[in-house]
Amino acid sequence: MINIRKTHPLMKIVNNAFIDLPAPSNISSWWNFGSLLGICLILQILTGLFLAMHYTSDTMTAFSSVTHICRDVNYGWIIRYMHANGASMFFICLFIHVGRGLYYGSYTFLETWNIGVILLFTVMATAFVGYVLPWGQMSFWGATVITNLLSAIPYIGTNLVEWIWGGFSVDKATLTRFFAFHFILPFIIAALAMVHLLFLHETGSNNPTGIPSDVDKIPFHPYYTIKDILGILFLFLFLMTLVLFAPDLLGDPDKYTPANPLNTPPHIKPEWYFLFAYAILRSIPNKLGGVLALVSSILILILMPFLHTSKQRSMMFRPFSQCLFWVLVADLLTLTWIGGQPVEYPFITIGQLASILYFLIILVLMPATSTIENNLLKW
């Protein structure tokens, strides 16, 4: 009997990607986060679609429409909080996924890695424009502050900002276009994710040892489908605990105050997942310098394959590099904490030191440590 799974043009693609895909036999739970990101994206698109059915992108009614969703729409409150906290889950999975790539040297798959960095930028852009939509105080002022950073670009900066705003300030035109961007970008992310997978399946997955695993492959289904389902269950457990018990734990109280252009909140800050980049931005007193540092903090990931000086791919057998990696993680957590603090002593100094350390570890210390390890192993 002909197996339709292996002959049908569409089924064949699914089969080669999720069923008969040869996968390394030793990949750990750190490899679960790719599939979790896919689930997060599907969840965000579905909850977002239902929210968009009731949302109005007008400055006069946006805040009221979000209130209406929570109060009057059947299960609107759970859809809204699943969407808001789903974004947090998305970024937790993203950061772990990128961290896994750094630790195990997955960045040597150049095309996959570069598309991953583009995906990271796109997801960050989507989250930013989405944060503006409820039109609370933090939405309005966050949009004003972050879009204003583009005015630091020499010569065209001011015109560029006014072009993005659609006027001389963040207003109705800005909200409408941000809603349009927020609707289209997830589908662009989905398309990019498919390209990401396409390039990954050209080379096959990396594994914790960083050694080619062609001699020892197992089919993706049932082994890793079961493993992924376990990860998905944990994801939903964590998400629904957050949604049902502490839906506003990760949010800012100012988003429950309607936007008021005449009243600036005491502390303008983005959602928690942008705080590390915000801290780097604030640690440089110059506007253009801050913007460049902000962009560089993410763009630096593109340099990772070229900064790899070790003879080994993974950090699994490199204890000094491992220590440095965890110092980098601690540094990013410090930056996240600093980003949420007011701009005053000692937070300014801590932020500046943490920002310098971030770039120092990636650009200097990691390549140097790898070279030292090579020499110690007489390679």
Swiss-Prot record:
Q: Where along this sequence does the record place binding of heme b b562?
A: 83, 182
Membrane-related topology note = Multi-pass membrane protein
Q: Which UniProt keywords apply?
A: Electron transport, Heme, Iron, Membrane, Metal-binding, Mitochondrion, Mitochondrion inner membrane, Respiratory chain, Transmembrane, Transmembrane helix, Transport, Ubiquinone
Transmembrane intervals: 33-53, 77-98, 113-133, 178-198, 226-246, 288-308, 320-340, 347-367
Where are the annotated coiled coils located?
A: none
> Which sites bind a ubiquinone?
201
Which residues are involved in binding heme b b566? 97, 196
Which is a GO BP term held by this UniProt record?
A: mitochondrial electron transport, ubiquinol to cytochrome c
A Pfam family it matches:
Cytochrom_B_C
What InterPro entries does this protein's entry cite? Cyt_b/b6_C, Cyt_b/b6_C_sf, Cyt_b/b6_N, Cytb/b6-like_sf, Cytochrome_b, Cytochrome_b_C_euk/bac, Cytochrome_b_N_euk/bac, Di-haem_cyt_TM
Please list the cofactors this protein needs. Answer: heme b
Chief subcellular location equals mitochondrion
Q: From the Swiss-Prot or TrEMBL record, state where the protein is found.
A: Mitochondrion inner membrane
Query: What top-level branch of life does the organism fall under?
Result: Eukaryota
* SUPFAM superfamilies membership: a domain/subunit of cytochrome bc1 complex (Ubiquinol-cytochrome c reductase) (SSF81648), Transmembrane di-heme cytochromes (SSF81342)
Q: How is the cofactor bound?
A: Binds 2 heme b groups non-covalently.
**Gene Ontology CC terms, in alphabetical order:** mitochondrial inner membrane; respiratory chain complex III
In its UniProt record, a GO molecular function of this protein is: ubiquinol-cytochrome-c reductase activity
Miscellaneous note, as given in the UniProt record, is: Heme 1 (or BL or b562) is low-potential and absorbs at about 562 nm, and heme 2 (or BH or b566) is high-potential and absorbs at about 566 nm.
SUBUNIT field: The cytochrome bc1 complex contains 11 subunits: 3 respiratory subunits (MT-CYB, CYC1 and UQCRFS1), 2 core proteins (UQCRC1 and UQCRC2) and 6 low-molecular weight proteins (UQCRH/QCR6, UQCRB/QCR7, UQCRQ/QCR8, UQCR10/QCR9, UQCR11/QCR10 and a cleavage product of UQCRFS1). This cytochrome bc1 complex then forms a dimer.
The record's comment on protein family reads: Belongs to the cytochrome b family.
Summary of the function given for this chain in its UniProt record: Component of the ubiquinol-cytochrome c reductase complex (complex III or cytochrome b-c1 complex) that is part of the mitochondrial respiratory chain. The b-c1 complex mediates electron transfer from ubiquinol to cytochrome c. Contributes to the generation of a proton gradient across the mitochondrial membrane that is then used for ATP synthesis.
Q: Give the protein name, as stated in the record.
A: Cytochrome b
Can you name the source organism? Dama dama
